[in-house]
Amino acid sequence: MPSYKSRKNNKKIKNKRKSRSSRRTYKNRRAVKGVGGAILGMGKDGCIIDSLNCPPYSKDAGYVAKLFKENHAVNAHLQAVLLSLDPDEKRFAQYKVPSDCPSSSSSFADNEDVALCKERLGSDIGTIAFMWILEPVDEKHLTKSQYRYLRESLEILHSHGITHGDLPGNVMIHPIDKMPRIIDWGNARISHDDDALVKQMDNNAFLMHFKIG
């Protein structure tokens, strides 16, 4: 039977080989460059677009952008009702979802690479990508006005029989007026009856996740 010292040395050699292999795999993964514009996956209300290798963000391998389709609503009737309630989208942002990649930042959107990305992605998708530049929200540190505004938005939905169904993680802040917008209506629905249970789930999610900081 090998001695304790021998077993320990063998384990070190094995871990060293594994570490080298992991580093090599990570390096190869980072070396892969996106061609841009190709649709990698598509769901019921959005699609994944291959990354663009834009110079300001070429330090890493590139980025994958998640863009929601503008003309293929999950629920056309729901979208029509939301537009009638909020035609300027000051409370409910529809399909103008910010990209997952840094290209949605204002510093990037202001430079001339926007035109290149629109050309590479296609005019429709490119327009959606840069039409809204929303910012993540710190759910635990809302101002009093932001908290009250979001509460009012939820009450407007419920008064018209609309439940969101997935509130946490789907609230963004508009960079100009600094007020919250509710996004991603994939799980939302209009209930013709007074569905108290679903409304209570919305209310519980609001009270649990959103706080004045």
Residue ranges, per PLM feature:
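ATP-binding glycine-rich loop module of kinase domains
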Residues: G37-A93, S104
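Feature marks short, surface-exposed loop/turn motifs that line or immediately flank catalytic pockets
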Residues: N71, V137-K140, R189
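Conserved kinase catalytic-core helix
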Residues: L83-D86, E135-R181
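Arg/Lys-rich, intrinsically disordered low-complexity tails that mediate electrostatic binding
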Residues: M1-G36
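Conserved structural core of kinase catalytic domains
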Residues: E89-Y147
